[in-house]
Amino acid sequence: MSLAGLEIGGVRVDACQRCDGRFVTSETMRSILEHDGVIAELRAVLPRAANPWAEGGRVYVKCPVCETLMNRRQYAQGSQVVIDWCKHHGIWFDAGELPRVLDFVAAGGLLRWALT
């Protein structure tokens, strides 16, 4: 997997040039979620293309850091986005998933589910 690092909103997001997926470390994701301005900037620049591999069924992705198969799970209750997650290194977002998660967060999705 060939990843290119992109600096967007002061955070590093790694992008796969083949499938347009994104890898975000756990630390970077926490930083994104703590700053509304970063969320807004990422939402403005990230492509919202659909995942070209979605019709192929469930595909397990290897972590680009440790090459262990990542776990699939819903990002957060109510998000309707299934991510690939390495508990040691971060989150893999298929093409279009990171903007969908950021839309969910910007709409108060994390707060809404935390209060219920």
Please tell me what each predicted stretch does.
Residues 1-2, 19-22, 68-69, 89-92:
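Cys/His-rich metal-chelating microdomains
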Residues 1-3, 40-51, 67-72:
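Short Cys/His-rich Zn2+-coordinating modules
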Residues 3-8, 26-29, 71-76, 94-97:
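Short Cys/His-rich "knuckle" micro-motifs
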Residues 16-19, 63-66, 86:
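Short cysteine-rich clusters marking metal-coordination/redox-active sites
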Residues 21-38, 90-107:
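Short metal-binding segments enriched for Cys and/or His
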Residues 1-17:
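The feature marks the first
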Residues 5-10, 49-62, 75-80:
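Short, flexible, mixed-charge glycine/proline-rich loop motifs
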Residues 34-58, 110-116:
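Intrinsic disorder/low-complexity detector
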